[in-house]
């Protein structure tokens, strides 16, 4: 079975083709970063309009890259949520239209499940059950994954998502949007512990996160100090250290509470090298394993959607429902299936 995956939940247009036996055949991503840079964040209306302009040419490009024709595609998977309503509707409409024209099934995919399964695209893959830390611009969640479709949200951010805070602080430090990766690069030049920021909610029971207080503390520090290169780097280092240590403490707590030894990190922020290094050391001391996708599969992409779609289509979970998207959609609402690959 070959599945065409379409991702349009936010500001990346992603299209990929995944083959059950040969793996990933093609993966194309168009980023709207430059389009939204002047606004300091994603503008939903602009995002949707740009998806409309780019998605059909990108599908043609992906088919050509894989040297395939529509008749060689057995199913279509598309991100139906969570995400921006207008952006989601573009991908869903195109996917359902092509499925009808090509006479093949289509399946709606949960964006965060696709991220959770992204490490499965690598040669070394995790096995269920495991704890997943999903960190992106819109989500910060700790999830217990017992099987595909069997998820329990152990904790999540009660305010800002990690990626969102990274981008906001990066802008205040004079970096361009999206600035998460640029902030991390700046932090490498920072002096450790010149500034020390709070690790929010680590002394409270439970696994929820809160980053609004850390954001406010960092903003106040930026505003009340000089903006020379070294000082900005020191602030970036303190901010990143606080984020990473907070995430790690909650991950360790989740592993201890569940007795699991396998941790998966995915989502855009999981590409952060400092976060990966910290968690690798932590899992080594815990005699556990850490899994994460390569950087191009951390950010939004069609490959993870195609893979998730393959699993669900093989389980017979396609539907002929009209175009439907869910801007808000919990992982816990997904149907459970047995892993069949």
Curated annotation (Swiss-Prot):
Identify the keywords attached in UniProt to this record, alphabetized. Answer: Acyltransferase, Cytoplasm, Iron, Metal-binding, Transferase, tRNA processing
Return the broad EC class: transferase
Q: What is its EC number?
A: 2.3.1.234
Tell me which Gene Ontology terms the entry assigns under biological process.
tRNA threonylcarbamoyladenosine modification
The answer to keyword Cytoplasm applying to this record is yes
How the cofactor is bound: the record states: Binds 1 Fe(2+) ion per subunit.
Q: Which Pfam families has this protein been placed in?
A: TsaD
GO cellular component terms given for this protein: cytoplasm
Task: Give the protein's cofactors.
Answer: Fe(2+)
Which residues take part in binding substrate? Answer: 134-138, 167, 180, 272
Superkingdom is Bacteria
Q: Note the HAMAP family from the entry.
A: TsaD
Protein's job: Required for the formation of a threonylcarbamoyl group on adenosine at position 37 (t(6)A37) in tRNAs that read codons beginning with adenine. Is involved in the transfer of the threonylcarbamoyl moiety of threonylcarbamoyl-AMP (TC-AMP) to the N6 group of A37, together with TsaE and TsaB. TsaD likely plays a direct catalytic role in this reaction.
Indicate what this protein is called per its UniProt record.
tRNA N6-adenosine threonylcarbamoyltransferase
What organism does this protein naturally occur in? Blochmanniella pennsylvanica (strain BPEN)
* Taxonomic lineage: Bacteria, Pseudomonadati, Pseudomonadota, Gammaproteobacteria, Enterobacterales
Q: Which gene encodes it?
A: tsaD
């Amino acid at each position: 079975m070959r599945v065409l995956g379409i991702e349009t939940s936010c500001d990346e247009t992603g299209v990929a083709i995944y083959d059950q036996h040969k793996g990933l055949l093609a993966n194309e991503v168009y980023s709207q970063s430059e389009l939204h840079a002047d606004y300091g964040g994603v503008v939903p209306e602009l995002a949707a309009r740009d998806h409309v302009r780019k998605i059909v040419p990108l599908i043609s490009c992906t088919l050509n890259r894989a040297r395939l024709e529509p008749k060689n595609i057995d199913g279509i998977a598309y991100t139906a949520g969570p995400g921006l309503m207008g952006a989601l509707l573009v991908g869903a409409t195109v996917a359902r239209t092509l499925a009808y024209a090509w006479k093949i099934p289509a399946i709606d995919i949960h964006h965060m499940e696709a991220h959770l399964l992204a490490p499965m695209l690598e040669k070394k893959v995790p096995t269920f059950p495991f704890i997943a830390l999903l960190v992106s611009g819109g989500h910060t969640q700790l999830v217990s994954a017992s099987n595909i479709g069997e998820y329990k949200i152990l904790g999540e951010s009660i305010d800002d998502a990690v990626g969102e805070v990274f981008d906001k602080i990066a802008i205040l430090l004079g970096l361009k949007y999206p600035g998460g990766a640029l902030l991390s690069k700046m932090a490498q030049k920072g002096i450790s512990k010149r500034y020390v920021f709070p690790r929010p909610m680590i002394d409270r029971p439970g696994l929820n996160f809160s980053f609004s207080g850390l954001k406010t503390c960092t903003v106040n520090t930026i505003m009340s100090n000089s903006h020379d290169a070294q000082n900005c780097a020191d602030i970036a280092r303190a901010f990143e250290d606080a984020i990473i240590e907070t995430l790690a403490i909650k991950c360790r707590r989740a592993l201890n509470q569940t007795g699991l030894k396998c941790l998966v990190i995915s989502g855009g922020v999981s590409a952060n090298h400092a976060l990966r290094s910290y968690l690798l050391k932590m899992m080594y001391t815990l005699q556990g394993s850490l899994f994460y996708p390569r950087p191009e599969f951390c950010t939004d992409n069609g490959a993870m959607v195609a893979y998730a779609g393959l699993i669900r289509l093989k389980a017979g979970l396609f539907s002929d429902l009209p175009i439907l998207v869910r801007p808000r959609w919990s992982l816990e609402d997904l149907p459970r299936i047995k892993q069949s690959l």
